[in-house]
């Protein structure tokens, strides 16, 4: 369908949604005809390409041809901030068509049943609450839109949404409702993502046409360097991302120098809503400002055009990097970012992430349904059926296509034995008052759990100087090339005070600093190639010093810890060094196969570290409502242990001279002098 023909088809909605732009974007031209044809679509396109209008305008165009009574369009987006931002953007065009728009979030908890909006913006948690408390308001529904689906998918919240859609379909099946579904995403590795949420999805895919330009600078005096770059490039508006809100807050004062002074702001989830919205509004209207933010602004919140993106330290994965840099330079075909690295390892991570982002290789973890959602959805569904109760068969149906019945039954039996569920009549079950507080405060509708990714900041006990960061806290550990012994742990603050007890292995000194370690294990092959470009993808370098074996794996801290601890369970004195090197003490490899621990050993390590992994993996608010064996299984699935074991089973060890090994690593990790 040509652009002019699309415009003619949008008789009512062209003016309100597109006239101020004058033309359609490429993704809009691809998508709109399919939605007008009432197909289910997945729209994959970079930030700021007009995905929202590409979906909502043709849905409303079709909607205006029929009955407009009641709630017609359910628009689900990951956060309250996005709901508020979308409301600001969509209120005027929608109301100009004599339709109504509303929002349902924790900030806006009430909607009038007698005056339902035609379009409702909400979050998965508020959708859960509405479905449990007022299911009949959805009886006239016409379309469902899932916004920023990549931020939910492959998480407990994404699986919660899948089950909620099953429950919605279960309600509507009596009236043979034929809902239209649309999902939107800025970055996706898996083009079949839509199939998890609805049937017959048509993918409308636009690869990033925007060139990525970046500059990497060391953290020392980085603010001074950034201001130099800003002056040369005439940069006026900057968005800086930090991996922790404490960094964003602490650096805000240091940025308050000419020409920005009082135009430096901070934005993160802990700020009051009114303050966040005030900052967003100022950034949108200002022609010169700096905003220091956390991952909350990875989302499509409107803060106007930004000239440059600063990334202070590498983000957790490539998808996050793409989201962040996509917030800048919206009026040009080029993305410009400045990466600030604390050490050479972080510089290598930055280079690798940017290279992968340029070719669209995201290395996301393989999809696995989260088991911790099962108890949450049992509670929510039983609350929906609180007046008449429900059967176990009906509960199986809402989990259709996600979990085997045997697993659901195991969870159900645990909740029954603990008195959270009771059988009032033969085969008819109800919730008891054991979780009445969670019901009263709406907690049964949320899978969001506090998480810190399992990281601890490590401080030297006598000086209080920050040494670095580790993922898993052992009694003794290696960090920054030295051996440390734990002295004091402040669990709430995720701080560890430690005492140096000696030098670490010689080669570990090159890995000083706070490298990130929560990336997918598949990325290790790409990272290794930067150090040893002549090795085959399946080859892993190692050397034997006559006593110990040192294997350079780069799997990251999560998997490095699992391998070392599991081998230790099997009698091998194994140590992981910062997720990069596996040291086998007093051990020589018998052949060229990578040392693979048994699955039983891995399960034992996970069982002994349930809480640490739960914190690191963000396993969901109801994780501990699972039976113990399913807690272990949930971690196994979340970590994709079967895939990981298959991956390392294909690796071959390649012996390298110790001097070449350490020399190569030092050469790469030390900055070259001009």
Residue ranges: model-predicted function:
Residues 149-150, 177, 319, 347-348, ...:
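ASCE RecA-like P-loop NTPase motor cores
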Residues 287, 317-365:
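Conserved segment of the helicase C-terminal RecA-like domain
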Residues 364-483, 488, 549-551:
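C-terminal accessory/connector segments of nucleic-acid motor ATPases
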Residues 538-570:
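Short Lys/Arg-enriched alpha/beta "domain-start" segment
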């Amino acid at each position: 369908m040509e652009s002019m023909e699309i415009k003619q088809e949008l008789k009512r909605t062209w003016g309100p949604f597109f006239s101020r732009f004058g033309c359609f974007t490429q993704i809009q031209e691809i998508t709109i005809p399919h939605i007008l044809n009432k197909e289910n679509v997945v729209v994959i396109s970079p930030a700021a390409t007009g995905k929202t209008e590409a979906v909502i305008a043709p849905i409303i165009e079709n909607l205006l041809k029929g009955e407009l009574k009641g709630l017609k369009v359910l628009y689900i987006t990951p956060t309250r901030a996005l709901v508020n931002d979308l409301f600001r953007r969509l209120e005027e065009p929608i109301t100009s068509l004599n339709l109504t728009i509303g929002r349902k979030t924790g900030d806006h908890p009430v909607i009038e049943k007698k005056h339902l909006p035609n379009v409702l913006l909400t979050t998965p948690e508020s959708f859960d609450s509405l479905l449990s408390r007022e299911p009949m308001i959805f009886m006239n529904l016409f379309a469902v839109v899932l916004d920023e689906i990549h931020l939910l998918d492959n998480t407990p919240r994404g699986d919660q949404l899948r089950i909620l859609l099953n429950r919605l379909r279960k309600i509507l099946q009596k009236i043979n409702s034929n809902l239209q579904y649309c999902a939107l995403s800025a970055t996706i590795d898996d083009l079949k993502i839509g199939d998890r949420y609805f049937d017959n999805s048509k993918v409308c895919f636009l690869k990033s046409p925007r060139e990525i330009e970046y500059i990497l600078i060391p953290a020392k005096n980085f603010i001074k360097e950034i201001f130099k770059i800003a002056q040369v490039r005439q940069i006026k508006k900057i968005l800086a991302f930090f991996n922790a809100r404490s960094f964003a807050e602490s650096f805000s004062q240091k940025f308050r120098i000419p020409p920005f002074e009082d135009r430096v702001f901070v934005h993160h989830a802990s700020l009051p809503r009114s303050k966040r919205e005030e900052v967003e509004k100022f950034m949108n209207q200002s022609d010169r400002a700096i905003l220091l933010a956390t991952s909350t602004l990875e989302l499509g919140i409107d803060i106007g055009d930004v000239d440059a993106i600063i990334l202070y330290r590498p983000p957790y994965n490539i998808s996050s990097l793409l989201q962040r840099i996509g917030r800048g330079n919206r009026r040009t075909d080029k993305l410009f970012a400045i990466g600030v690295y604390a050490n050479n390892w972080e510089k290598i991570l930055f280079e690798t992430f940017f290279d992968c982002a340029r070719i669209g290789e995201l290395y996301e973890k393989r999809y696995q349904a989260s088991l911790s959602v099962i108890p949450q959805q049992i509670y929510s569904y039983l609350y929906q059926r609180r007046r008449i109760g429900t059967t176990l068969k009906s509960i199986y149906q809402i989990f259709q296509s996600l979990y085997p019945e045997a697993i659901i039954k195991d969870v159900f039996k645990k909740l029954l034995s603990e008195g959270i569920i009771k059988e009032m009549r033969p085969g008819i079950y109800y919730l008891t008052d054991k979780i009445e507080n969670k019901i009263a405060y709406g907690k049964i509708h949320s899978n969001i759990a506090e998480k810190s990714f399992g990281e601890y900041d490590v401080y030297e006990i006598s000086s209080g100087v920050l040494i670095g960061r580790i993922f898993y806290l052992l009694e003794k550990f290696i960090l920054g090339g030295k051996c440390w012994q734990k002295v004091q742990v402040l669990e709430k603050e995720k701080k560890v005070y430690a005492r140096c007890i000696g030098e670490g292995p010689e080669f570990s000194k090159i890995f000083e600093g706070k490298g990130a370690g929560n990336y997918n294990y598949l990325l290790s092959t790409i990272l290794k190639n930067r150090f040893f470009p002549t090795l085959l993808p399946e080859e892993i370098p190692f050397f034997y010093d006559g006593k110990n074996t040192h294997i350079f794996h780069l799997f990251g801290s999560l998997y490095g810890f699992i391998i070392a601890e599991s081998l230790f369970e099997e009698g091998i004195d194994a140590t992981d060094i910062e997720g990069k090197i596996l040291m086998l003490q007093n051990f020589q490899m018998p052949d060229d196969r990578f040392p693979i621990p048994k699955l039983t050993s891995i399960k034992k390590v996970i069982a002994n570290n349930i809480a640490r992994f739960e914190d690191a993996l963000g396993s969901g608010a109801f994780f501990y409502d699972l039976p113990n064996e399913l807690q272990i299984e949930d971690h196994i699935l979340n970590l994709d242990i079967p895939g990981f074991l298959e991956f390392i089973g294909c690796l071959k060890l390649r012996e390298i001279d110790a001097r070449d090994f350490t020399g190569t690593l030092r050469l790469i990790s030390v900055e070259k002098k001009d």
